[in-house]
Amino acid sequence: MDRIPLPPMERPLIAILRGLKPEEAEGVVGALIETGFTAIEIPLNSPDPFRSIETAVKMAPAGCLIGAGTVLTTAQVERLADVGGRLMVSPNVEPAVIRLAATKGMVTMPGVFTPTEALAAAAAGASGLKFFPASVLGPSGITAIRAVLPGDLEIAAVGGVSEVNFADYAAIGIRSFGLGSSLYKPGMSAGDVRQRAIATLAAYDAVYGGQQ
């Protein structure tokens, strides 16, 4: 199956809003978009996640990538398509889930930790790979695994990543990240999220500004 590529993004950062409630979605998502985030993931173990995703899809401008994380089944992929999601992130490698999401036109980012998982995800047509948890693998672990992967496959570091270690990953050529608790924790106000987003993007630009 042909791989659906990640769309061009000035900053390839995915905001992970685990625990977001539907009534908070408009304010929090709006704050992220206003500050410059263009990819947003709402994990399916959040309260009533598809309502939040639908809200985000409806309010996001063209070019924003909105979707779900913790996608485990093909039924969840179908539901995600129904609400207009275009991003499918999973914690594991399930070829049937990846392939169905691709047929729905979604960008797919399965989670991997080993060379076997990474190659299986690539064979299933994943748009990119989510190396998780990046805090355990570290830059050296990701470098070792990346050596055996297709060169055109996008790699994102997720889990334990924040503005304090962007430079560590920049040193090995990684510029895509999924940002969770360093950016958003359940119950945070839209104003607090906006301030965290501003600080995060400033730190990213300080490291990667010359590479964009």
UniProtKB/Swiss-Prot annotation:
Native source organism of the sequence: Rhizobium meliloti (strain 1021)
CDD domains, per database record: KDPG_aldolase (cd00452)
Residues annotated as catalytic: E41 (proton donor/acceptor), K130 (schiff-base intermediate with substrate)
EC number per UniProt: 4.1.2.21
Role, per record: Involved in the degradation of galactose via the DeLey-Doudoroff pathway. Catalyzes the reversible, stereospecific retro-aldol cleavage of 2-keto-3-deoxy-6-phosphogalactonate (KDPGal) to pyruvate and D-glyceraldehyde-3-phosphate.
PROSITE patterns found in the cross-reference section: ALDOLASE_KDPG_KHG_2
Gene3D superfamilies registered for this protein in UniProt: Aldolase class I
GO BP of this protein: D-galactonate catabolic process
Residues that, per the record, bind 2-dehydro-3-deoxy-6-phospho-D-galactonate: R18, T70, K130, G160, G180, S181
Catalytic activity: 2-dehydro-3-deoxy-6-phospho-D-galactonate = D-glyceraldehyde 3-phosphate + pyruvate
Protein family (similarity comment): Belongs to the KHG/KDPG aldolase family.
Keywords linked to the UniProt accession: Carbohydrate metabolism, Lyase
Protein name: Probable 2-dehydro-3-deoxy-6-phosphogalactonate aldolase
MF term (GO), any: 2-dehydro-3-deoxy-6-phosphogalactonate aldolase activity
Domain of life according to the entry: Bacteria
NCBIfam families xrefs: PRK09140.1 (NF006600)
Site (Plays a major role in determining the stereoselectivity): V158
UniProt KW Transport keyword: no
InterPro entries registered for this protein in UniProt: Aldlse_KDPG_KHG, Aldolase_TIM, KDPG/KHG_AS_2
Swiss-Prot/TrEMBL site (Orients the nucleophilic substrate) positions: R18
Changes seen on gene knockout: Cells lacking this gene fail to grow on galactose as sole carbon source.
Subunit structure: Homotrimer.
Pathway the protein takes part in: Carbohydrate acid metabolism; D-galactonate degradation; D-glyceraldehyde 3-phosphate and pyruvate from D-galactonate: step 3/3
Lineage: Bacteria, Pseudomonadati, Pseudomonadota, Alphaproteobacteria, Hyphomicrobiales
